C-alpha cells in the first residue's frame, strides 16, 4: 500500500535511492509543487510534478514509482477511469499533423462546434468515421503519393467494404523514393540512418533519398534480369538497410515480396515458400546478434527454395558454401541491366492500387499460417496511422526494432518514406546498451517497442546514463503492457507519451490506439483509430452503447481502408465475417479480441475470443503448440496449451497441461517443461518459451468432446493466485 503524496517524507526518498542531502532538496521541491495543488485532482498533481520536471530521467526508478503511485494512491479507476500521466498542451496539439489539419478544416467541417484540436478531437474523429472519404482526401494529400493514373474518387460505396481509390494506378515504392514538395522531401534529405552492432562508437551511417533511390533501382534492374513481373520473391533476413533496398526494389520491379521472419525454423520457412509459390529468396549467410553468429543460409536451404540470393552479414565475402543454383549478392548485382544513360535508372512497373505487393503471414487457429496479401492501399493506411497517431513527419527519426517478416517492418518503412521522416535501423540485438546508444546518437524522435523488450531494458538497467530526451513519442504493440514497465520507459524521456497500438496484419493498421491530442494512461488505448468504427458486443452478439463501460468481443465496421478483401489460402469471408453479428444492417468484421472499455472511454485488450495466443508479440494457436508438444516425449498422451496474463499485466505466459500415458516412465513437470521448450523452439519458433507445465489425469471437455481450454486457464490462474497469497 502506497502512502499519499502529502505523507511522503525525506526518509521515503532515501529509501527510494537518493542520498540524504539530495532527499532533503527533493522533499522541498515536491512540497512546493504539491502545496499549490494539494486540494486538486491527483491528475493535476501529477501534471504539475511533470511540468516542473521534478523527476529526472537519471533518478532511480523506485523514486519514479514512489511519486506516481503515491499521487494515485487513493484513485478509484472504476469511478474515474485509468490514472493519467501525460497531458497535451494546446500549443503542442496545434503543432501536430492532425492538429494542423483540424485547425485548417475543422471550422468549415464542424461549424461553431469546433473549438481546438484538444476539445474537438473526439468530434473530429467521429466525423472521420461518418465521412471517411472526406478525411482520407485530406490525409492522402499529406503523403508523398504520385499517381500514374489518379483515382476516380476516394470511396465507392457500392460494396459493404467499399472500393478505395478506384481506378488509381501507381507504384508505391516509387512514391517512397522520389522528391516531393509536400511533404518536403529533397534528394539530399536523409532517408535512412543505421549502425551495425559492434560499431557503437562509430558515427551513425546515413543515406540520402537520392542514394537510396539509386541503390533500389540498381537492385530492381538485377531483379528484372532474373525474375518476371508478378513473381513472388521472399526476404528472410534481419531488417538491415540492404533488406529495405531489396524490399522496395522487388515492388518497383512489379514483383511481390514474401515476408519471412528471420527467427523461423526451416519447416516454417518451407511452409511460407510453398504457400506463396516463391520463385526465389534473399537471405544472409549468418545473423550477427549479441556478439554471436547464428546460421541463416543453412536454415533457408533446409527449406528447399528454388533459388537463393545470399548477402554477407558483414564485409563483402560470404562465409558459407553455396548450392549450385544459388548466387552471391555481388554476382547478382553484376547481372543488373545497365540503363542507356549509364546511371542506375529503372522505370517503375505501374499497377492498379488493388494489386498485391507483399504477402505477410499471421497464424490462424488451424495450424497453417494465413497468407495475408497487402495491396498498394495497405502502405497508405499504415503511413496515415503513423502520421495521425504518432505524429510522424519531416524532421523526425523513427526507429522500431522489428523485421520485414512482421507487419511492423513494412509499417515502419512506409510510415517514414511516405511522410518524409528518416528511418532508423540498428543491425544487431536491441536488448542491450548498443541499441540504446544508437537511439541517442541517431537523434531518434519516435521509438517503437514491444513490452518484453522494455522489461529487459528495465531489468538489466542497460540504458542507464543515455540521453533519450529527443524522443517525442514512444509506441508499443504486440502484447499487453505492464504499467510499471511503461512508467520506466516514459520516465527515460521526461515522461513522453507511450502510444499503445493494437491492430493486425490484415488491417494494415491499428483499430485502437493512443493519440497526441488526448491525455494518456499507462497500458491503455485512448481511442479507436481515425475513421475506425468499433462495436463491443456481449456473448449473444448484442452491442453495448458506444459510451458505456463494458467488456466484450470487438467487431469492426468493414469499410476500412487498407484492410484485406482476400486471403491466399483461406476463405476470407469465413475467417473474418461468418458468424459475426449485424449492426445497422452491416455485418461486422471479426478481429477476435476481447476488449474492455473503461470509465472515461479508454480501452484495454483482455485477450482473444478464440484460442489464439500472443507469445512475445507473435500470434500463434493452441492447436499448433499442442501439435508439437504431443511429439515431445513418448510418455505424452495429449497436451493442452493456454496462456495466462500475469496479475500485474505484461506479456502472456505459456502454460502446457499434459496427460501422460500409462506404462511409460513418468516425467516431472520440470522435465517436461524443458522438453516442451526444446521441441517448440526447434519446430515452431525459437522465441517461444514455456513458463509452466501442469500434469493432470484428464482434460475437461464438452458433451461433444471439445476441449475446454477456458476451464484449464481458469484453473491454473486460481492455483497461481492461491500460491501467491500464501507467499
Swiss-Prot record:
Its EC number is 6.2.1.-. GO terms for biological process: auxin metabolic process; fatty acid metabolic process. PROSITE patterns: AMP_BINDING. GO terms for molecular function: ligase activity. Its main location: other. Keywords: Fatty acid metabolism, Ligase, Lipid metabolism, Peroxisome. GO terms for cellular component: peroxisome. A motif (Microbody targeting signal) lies at residues 725-727. Disruption phenotype: No visible phenotype under normal growth conditions, but plants are resistant to 2,4-DB. It is found in: Peroxisome. Expressed in flowers. Belongs to the ATP-dependent AMP-binding enzyme family. May be involved in the peroxisomal activation of 2,4-dichlorophenoxybutyric acid (2,4-DB), a precursor of active auxins that inhibit root growth. This is Probable acyl-activating enzyme 18, peroxisomal. It comes from Arabidopsis thaliana (Mouse-ear cress). The lineage of its organism: Eukaryota, Viridiplantae, Streptophyta, Embryophyta, Tracheophyta.
Amino acid at each position: 500500500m502506497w502512502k499519499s503524496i502529502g505523507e511522503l517524507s525525506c526518509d521515503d526518498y532515501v529509501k527510494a535511492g537518493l542520498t540524504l542531502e539530495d532527499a532533503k532538496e527533493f522533499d522541498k521541491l515536491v512540497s512546493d509543487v504539491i502545496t499549490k495543488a494539494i486540494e486538486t485532482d491527483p491528475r493535476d498533481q501529477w501534471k504539475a510534478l511533470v511540468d516542473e520536471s521534478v523527476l529526472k530521467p537519471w533518478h532511480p526508478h523506485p523514486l519514479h514509482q514512489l511519486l506516481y503511485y503515491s499521487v494515485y494512491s487513493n484513485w478509484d479507476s472504476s469511478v474515474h477511469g485509468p490514472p493519467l500521466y501525460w497531458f497535451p498542451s494546446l500549443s503542442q496539439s496545434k503543432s501536430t499533423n492532425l492538429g494542423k489539419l483540424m485547425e485548417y478544416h475543422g471550422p468549415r467541417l464542424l461549424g461553431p462546434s469546433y473549438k481546438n484540436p484538444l476539445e474537438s478531437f473526439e468530434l473530429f474523429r467521429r466525423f472521420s468515421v461518418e465521412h471517411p472519404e472526406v478525411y482520407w482526401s485530406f490525409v492522402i494529400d499529406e503523403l508523398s503519393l504520385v499517381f500514374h493514373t489518379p483515382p476516380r474518387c476516394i470511396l465507392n460505396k457500392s460494396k459493404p467494404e467499399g472500393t478505395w481509390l478506384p481506378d488509381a494506378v501507381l507504384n508505391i515504392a516509387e512514391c517512397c523514393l522520389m522528391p516531393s514538395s509536400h511533404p518536403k522531401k529533397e534528394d539530399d534529405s536523409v532517408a535512412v540512418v543505421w549502425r551495425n552492432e559492434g560499431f557503437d562508437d562509430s558515427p551513425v551511417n546515413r543515406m540520402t533519398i537520392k542514394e537510396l533511390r539509386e541503390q533500389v533501382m540498381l537492385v530492381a534492374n538485377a531483379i528484372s534480369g532474373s525474375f518476371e513481373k508478378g513473381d513472388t520473391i521472399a526476404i528472410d533476413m534481419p531488417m538491415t538497410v540492404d533488406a529495405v533496398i531489396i524490399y522496395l526494389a522487388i515492388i518497383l520491379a512489379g514483383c511481390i515480396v514474401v515476408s519471412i521472419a528471420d527467427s523461423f525454423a526451416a519447416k516454417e520457412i518451407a511452409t511460407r515458400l510453398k504457400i506463396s509459390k516463391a520463385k526465389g529468396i534473399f537471405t544472409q549467410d549468418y545473423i550477427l546478434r549479441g556478439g554471436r553468429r547464428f546460421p541463416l543460409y543453412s536454415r533457408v536451404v533446409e527449406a528447399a527454395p528454388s533459388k537463393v540470393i545470399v548477402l554477407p552479414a558483414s564485409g563483402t565475402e560470404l562465409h558459407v558454401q553455396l548450392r549450385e543454383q544459388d548466387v552471391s549478392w555481388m554476382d547478382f548485382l553484376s547481372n543488373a541491366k545497365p540503363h542507356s544513360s549509364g546511371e542506375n535508372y529503372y522505370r517503375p512497373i505501374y499497377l492498379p492500387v488493388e494489386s498485391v505487393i507483399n504477402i505477410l503471414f499471421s497464424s490462424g487457429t488451424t495450424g497453417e499460417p494465413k497468407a495475408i496479401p497487402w495491396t498498394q492501399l495497405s502502405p497508405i493506411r499504415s503511413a496515415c496511422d503513423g502520421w495521425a497517431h504518432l505524429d510522424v513527419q519531416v524532421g523526425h527519426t523513427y526507429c522500431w526494432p522489428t523485421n520485414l517478416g512482421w507487419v511492423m517492418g513494412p509499417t515502419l518503412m512506409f510510415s517514414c518514406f511516405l511522410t518524409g521522416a528518416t528511418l532508423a535501423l540498428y543491425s544487431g540485438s536491441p536488448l542491450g546498451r548498443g541499441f540504446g546508444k544508437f537511439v541517442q546518437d541517431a537523434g531518434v524522435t519516435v521509438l517503437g517497442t514491444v513490452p518484453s523488450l522494455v522489461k529487459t531494458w528495465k531489468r538489466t538497467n542497460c540504458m542507464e546514463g543515455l540521453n533519450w530526451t529527443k524522443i517525442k513519442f514512444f509506441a508499443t504493440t504486440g502484447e499487453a503492457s505492464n504499467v510499471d514497465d511503461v512508467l520506466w520507459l516514459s520516465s527515460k524521456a521526461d515522461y513522453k507519451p507511450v502510444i499503445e497500438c493494437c491492430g493486425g496484419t490484415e488491417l494494415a493498421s491499428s483499430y485502437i490506439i493512443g493519440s497526441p491530442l488526448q491525455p494518456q494512461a499507462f497500458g491503455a488505448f485512448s481511442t479507436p483509430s481515425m475513421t475506425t468504427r468499433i462495436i463491443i458486443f456481449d456473448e449473444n452478439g448484442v452491442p453495448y452503447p458506444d459510451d458505456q463501460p463494458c467488456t466484450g468481443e470487438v467487431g469492426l465496421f468493414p469499410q476500412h481502408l487498407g484492410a484485406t478483401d482476400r486471403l491466399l489460402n483461406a476463405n476470407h469471408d469465413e475467417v473474418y465475417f461468418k458468424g459475426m453479428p449485424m449492426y445497422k444492417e452491416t455485418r461486422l468484421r471479426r478481429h477476435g479480441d476481447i476488449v474492455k472499455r473503461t470509465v472515461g472511454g479508454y480501452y484495454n485488450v483482455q485477450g482473444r475470443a478464440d484460442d489464439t495466443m500472443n507469445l512475445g508479440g507473435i500470434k500463434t494457436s493452441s492447436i499448433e503448440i499442442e501439435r508439437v508438444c504431443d511429439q515431445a516425449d513418448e510418455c505424452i498422451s495429449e497436451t493442452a496449451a493456454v496462456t495466462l496474463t500475469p496479475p500485474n499485466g505484461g506479456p502472456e505466459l505459456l502454460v502446457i497441461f499434459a496427460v501422460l500415458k500409462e506404462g511409460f516412465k513418468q516425467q516431472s513437470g520440470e522435465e517436461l517443461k524443458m522438453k516442451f521448450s526444446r521441441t517448440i523452439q526447434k519446430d515452431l519458433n525459437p522465441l517461444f518459451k514455456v513458463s509452466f507445465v501442469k500434469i493432470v489425469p484428464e482434460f475437461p471437455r464438452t458433451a461433444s468432446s471439445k476441449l475446454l481450454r477456458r476451464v484449464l486457464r481458469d484453473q491454473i490462474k486460481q492455483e497461481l493466485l492461491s500460491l501467491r497469497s500464501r507467499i
